[in-house]
Structures are given as structure tokens and as C-alpha cells.
From Swiss-Prot:
Residue ranges occupied by any Sm domain in the UniProt entry: 1-76
N-acetylthreonine: residues carrying this PTM: 2
A GO cellular component annotation in the UniProt record: nucleus
Organism: Homo sapiens
Protein name as annotated: U6 snRNA-associated Sm-like protein LSm8
GO BP field: mRNA splicing, via spliceosome
InterPro entries assigned: Lsm8, LSM_dom_sf, PTHR15588, Sm, Sm_dom_euk/arc
Length: 96
């Protein structure tokens, strides 16, 4: 059985972590425990008082036990966003 994540290899994905972070990058690999390898990644930090801050992370590993959601990003739509004008409350941590 192949993992649904194989369809995302070498594509731009957004990862929401269980501590409420949003990390965007190119999925380069993963393992059976959903540890993720992202390249050219950055974190999007949301704030209700100012625009989205992008923190460059580069090559980055996300531990599988910290992954809440993974989704593919439409690069055309994403590049059209004016992140400097988007204001939003940061996500809360996942409650177990």
C-alpha cells in the first residue's frame, strides 16, 4: 500500500503542527511515522495586529508526532496572496 503523501513529493505543502505553527515548503521525503523533510521552507507567523511574518527555515525536518495537518498548496493562488495585509489570530495548540 502506498502512502497518500507520495503524491506530494516535490510539491509545495503546508504543514500545521500540533503546537499551532504553519510551515510551508517542498516535501522531499517522509517515513512511516510521518517525519517530514521540507526544503526551501518557511514558517508563517500570524498576528491580529500586523501582517503575516515569514521566517526562513530552509531545509527542515518536522517530527511526525508534531504533524496535525498536511495539504498541498496551489502555488499560483499562494503567490497572489498579499501576506503583508493578512491579519489572523495565531492557531492554538492541539488539545488531546
Amino acid at each position: 500500500m502506498t502512502s497518500a503523501l507520495e503524491n506530494y513529493i516535490n510539491r509545495t505543502v503546508a504543514v500545521i503542527t500540533s503546537d499551532g505553527r504553519m510551515i510551508v515548503g517542498t516535501l522531499k521525503g517522509f517515513d512511516q511515522t510521518i517525519n517530514l523533510i521540507l526544503d526551501e521552507s518557511h514558517e508563517r507567523v500570524f498576528s491580529s495586529s500586523q501582517g503575516v511574518e515569514q521566517v526562513v527555515l530552509g531545509l527542515y525536518i518536522v517530527r511526525g508526532d508534531n504533524v496535525a495537518v498536511i495539504g498541498e498548496i496551489d502555488e499560483e493562488t499562494d503567490s497572489a496572496l498579499d501576506l503583508g495585509n493578512i491579519r489572523a489570530e495565531p492557531l492554538n495548540s492541539v488539545a488531546h
